[in-house]
């Protein structure tokens, strides 16, 4: 997942040393590299610092806009260039201040960051709806159109996008409607921040006895906090939080169907306070779209996406659903038969029907029994530090980069002791490396931290003047289990996929070469393409040779046996139709609630559960769960009416991989072409043109359909 912190101002985000564990990012001798020309950001903020800097930004921004509104005869030199400079310089500090709510271990700092986000979002809305500035941009837009051939491309695109974003935001409407729009946007912003805060701050858990957790190995049980039962002081209970490293193993390994059901429903029904926030937001979005002349919020939010409108999106999703359902039914029947056989053998009185909370368990059991895939055993060959070092080596080979971990004695350049800070260098000229930027790895869960996996762009690249570049800063935030006294953190294969994916976003952030920050990084491309670069890189995590090279058993240092890897790779598409149907549930729910014309009578709970049962094909067992209360994507300006983008982008990701890398995954020539054509150009050129140049033809969906088993 990609989270962009700073919205454009003109638009509407102890590892114990063990034998055979390589030191993190020690591939190069750091003394052979020059000192980075740009120091990493300083993270030693206090709540007072955050508040003070926020107020300073607000005052400076209002003063700047006031001065720009008074410019007579606005032109590129006296109006546009000052705006670009202002936007470039402001983005990094805003992103720092608002990022801390997701990662700081200090609740006072998180709260200050949330307050900063609310104030800065309100400022952004105020500024984006200033009619006097819109009129200035309208004058400049008219001027640059008349002499387009003599205007630099980035400048032209900047003015064009600014003007069109103003129109999209309703600046051509009368003052009364503009005020209504401003009020609605501010309410939506507050809702989004509170929804996210509730998720980040939740400390909910469910308790089980060891007997109830039968099937969950001791290696997992040791990571759970234990408490004594209120009913029996001699009984130990295990606290299972809803963080991924806790809840997923229970859903996957607990042999008790009742335990799985309780865990599933508790996880799905966490943060109940978010339901009212979501419902209010849906109504506000519908009202906003209506004011702006759109029939639905989906069509309003799709205006700058590749798909362009909700009809195209719904046709794409429904066509895919119809193709996948027959295959999904075949996959499901096998799993249903497995459960029925279990009930017949083990518990005559148990319910033989297959429910949504059974799926992770029987999916895992099927892999184990039919492919001899023991995911826990496989993880022993992928200790976190050694594996990430190996993954970075792949990125180094593909993109001609070098990753060098750096530290400062006072830890002012990181926000937590767990965080790794890495300088990235371009090695196109190995005798004279060029600095690329900074990337952070924040990989373990903790209280108050963002609970999923995401890349946060903290500062996009831009030119300060004709010869000096401000370098990008980006952060990977994940939640991999920490090491224990007995073993290091071990990565499951799906976690390796996750890291590869998020690092793909990070590389997109780092290699941008345009002059203006607005046109660099993932946030500069259409949001239904933004996942494609990362999805493409996931293919390397299914390559036999790359996985063997990555492996290093945490006790012996041995490479993983080929038999284990061969079995794992065979499972790539096992139950793939059911997995994709689950993604379609998210995408179609997102579109359903954002195209509904009668929200007053919409039961969001019934809609969520009925769609899941109909699309995923798996029974809800008569229960109603509220997974939408933790569906963070739907509260994002970018991902709302946009979750379809994961599948849409996968069409391009699969095409790029099979065309350029399937036969030679470490082809550096193709990797550098990809870096320079698809990534480094950002949003300055049409993404379809970039794809056509890189592929040597128009993009095709054939490889995507083959991957899904829908085409020979």
UniProtKB/Swiss-Prot annotation:
Establish whether keyword Zinc is in the entry.
Answer: yes
Q: Which residues form the signal peptide?
A: none
Name where it mostly resides: cytoplasm
What GO biological process, any one, is recorded here?
A: proteolysis
The answer to keyword Phosphoprotein applying to this record is yes
Record: residues binding Zn(2+): 501, 505, 508
Positions annotated as active site in the UniProt record: 502
Q: Where in the cell is it found?
A: Cytoplasm
Q: What is its EC number?
A: 3.4.24.37
- InterPro entries referenced in this protein's UniProt entry, alphabetically: MetalloPept_cat_dom_sf, Neurolysin/TOP_dom2, Neurolysin/TOP_N, Pept_M3A_M3B, Pept_M3A_M3B_dom
MF GO annotations: metal ion binding; metalloendopeptidase activity
Per the record, residues carrying Phosphoserine are 73
Q: Which UniProt keywords apply?
A: Cytoplasm, Hydrolase, Metal-binding, Metalloprotease, Phosphoprotein, Protease, Zinc
Which SUPFAM superfamilies does UniProt cross-reference here?
Metalloproteases ('zincins'), catalytic domain
Note on how the cofactor is bound? Binds 1 zinc ion.
Reaction(s) catalysed by this chain, per the record, are: Cleavage of Pro-|-Phe and Ala-|-Ala bonds
Question: GO CC annotations?
Answer: cytoplasm; fungal-type vacuole; Golgi apparatus; mitochondrial intermembrane space; mitochondrion
Q: What does this protein do?
A: Could be involved in late stage of protein degradation.
UniProt family annotation:
Belongs to the peptidase M3 family.
| General remark | Present with 8910 molecules/cell in log phase SD medium.
Protein name listed in UniProt: Saccharolysin
């Amino acid at each position: 997942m990609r989270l962009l912190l700073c919205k454009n101002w003109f638009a509407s985000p102890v590892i114990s040393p063990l034998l055979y564990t390589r030191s993190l990012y020690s591939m190069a001798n750091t003394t052979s590299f020059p000192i980075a020309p740009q120091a990493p950001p300083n993270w030693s903020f206090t709540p007072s610092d955050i508040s003070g800097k926020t107020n300073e930004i607000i005052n400076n921004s209002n003063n700047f806009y006031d001065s720009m509104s008074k410019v007579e005869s606005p032109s590129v030199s006296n109006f546009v260039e000052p705006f670009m400079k202002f936007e470039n310089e402001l983005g990094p500090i805003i992103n720092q201040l608002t990022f801390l709510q997701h990662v700081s271990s200090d609740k006072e700092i998180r709260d200050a960051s949330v307050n900063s986000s609310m104030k800065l979002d309100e400022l952004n809305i105020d500024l984006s709806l200033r009619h006097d500035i819109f009129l200035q941009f309208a004058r400049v837009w008219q001027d640059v159109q008349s002499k387009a051939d003599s205007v630099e491309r980035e400048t032209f695109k900047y003015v064009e996008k600014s003007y069109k974003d103003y129109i999209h935001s309703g600046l051509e409407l009368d003052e009364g409607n503009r005020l209504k729009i401003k009020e609605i946007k501010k309410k939506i912003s507050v809702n989004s921040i509170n929804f996210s805060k509730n998720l980040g701050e939740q400390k909910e858990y469910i308790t089980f006895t060891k007997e109830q957790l039968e099937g969950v190995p001791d290696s997992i049980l040791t990571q759970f906090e234990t408490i004594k039962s209120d009913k029996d002081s001699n009984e130990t209970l295990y606290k299972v939080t809803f963080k991924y490293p806790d809840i997923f193993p229970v859903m996957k390994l607990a042999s008790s169907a009742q335990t799985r059901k309780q865990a599933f429903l508790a996880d799905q029904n966490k943060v109940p306070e978010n339901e009212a926030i979501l419902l209010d937001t849906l109504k506000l979005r519908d009202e906003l779209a209506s004011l702006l002349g759109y029939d639905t919020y989906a069509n309003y939010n799709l205006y700058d996406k590749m798909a362009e409108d909700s009809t195209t999106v719904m046709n794409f999703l429904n066509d895919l659903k119809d193709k996948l359902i027959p295959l999904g039914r075949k996959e499901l029947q096998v799993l249903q038969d497995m459960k029925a056989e279990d009930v017949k053998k083990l518990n005559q009185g148990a319910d033989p029907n297959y429910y949504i909370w059974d799926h992770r368990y029987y999916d895992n059991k099927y892999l184990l029994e039919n492919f001899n895939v023991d995911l826990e055993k496989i993880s022993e060959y992928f200790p976190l530090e050694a594996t990430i070092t190996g993954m970075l080596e792949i990125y180094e080979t593909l993109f001609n980069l070098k990753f060098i971990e750096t530290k400062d004695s006072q830890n002012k350049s990181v926000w937590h002791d767990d965080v790794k800070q890495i300088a990235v260098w371009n090695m196109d000229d190995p005798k004279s490396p060029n600095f690329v930027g900074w990337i952070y790895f924040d990989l373990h869960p903790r209280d108050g931290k963002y609970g999923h996996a995401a890349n946060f762009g903290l500062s996009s690249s831009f030119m300060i003047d004709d010869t000096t570049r401000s370098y990008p800063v980006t952060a990977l935030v994940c939640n991999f289990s920490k090491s224990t006294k007995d073993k290091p953190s071990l990565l499951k294969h799906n976690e390796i996929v996750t890291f590869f994916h998020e690092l793909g976003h990070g590389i997109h952030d780092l290699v941008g070469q345009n002059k203006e920050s607005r046109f660099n990084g993932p946030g500069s491309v259409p949001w239904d393409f933004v996942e494609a670069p990362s999805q493409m890189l996931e293919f390397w995590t299914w390559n036999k040779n790359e996985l063997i090279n990555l492996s290093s058993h945490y006790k012996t240092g041995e490479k993983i046996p080929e038999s284990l890897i061969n079995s794992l790779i065979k499972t790539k598409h096992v139950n793939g139709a059911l997995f994709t149907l689950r993604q379609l549930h998210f995408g179609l729910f997102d579109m359903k609630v954002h195209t509904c014309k009668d929200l007053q009578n919409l039961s969001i709970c019934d809609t969520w559960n009925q769609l899941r049962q109909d699309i995923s094909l798996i029974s809800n067992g008569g229960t109603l769960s509220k997974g939408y209360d933790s569906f963070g994507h739907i509260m994002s300006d970018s991902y709302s009416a946009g979750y379809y983008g994961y599948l849409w982008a996968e069409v391009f990701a699969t095409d790029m991989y099979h065309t350029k890398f399937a036969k030679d995954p470490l082809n550096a020539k193709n990797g550098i072409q990809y870096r320079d054509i698809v990534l480094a150009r950002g949003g300055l050129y049409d993404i379809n043109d970039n794809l056509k140049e890189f592929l040597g033809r128009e993009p095709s969906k054939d490889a995507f359909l083959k991957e899904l088993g829908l085409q020979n």
